[in-house]
């Protein structure tokens, strides 16, 4: 729970949010992120640099039979975006807090995503 971007409102990432710090060590085997969704058979699309979740919110409405996984490494934006998706009842969307490059390189099974979206990712950590 957090406030900040929400101007005093408590943010709750609920089941939408995934904190990569809670994942098992990457040497314990690869993860298939499709297993995080209710319908694992739907295609998976990944967005890197999800910010406040605007693309995920809009695209999940346009593509209800697609699972979306967004990555954001700025904690405040992650919490705001995941809370926003949760409040809007998006069941086919998850938002991960952490480095997408690290996840895709070390944790994620190969060839699980149909599409990777890169719109406003920040390539330079501050």
How does the language model describe each region?
Residues 1-46, 54-61:
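S-adenosyl-L-methionine
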Residues 113-126:
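A short SAM/SAH-binding and catalytic strip from SAM-dependent methyltransferases
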Residues 105-115:
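A short acidic, Gly/Pro-enriched loop at the edge of an enzyme's catalytic core
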Residues 43-105:
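SAM cofactor-binding core of SAM-dependent methyltransferases
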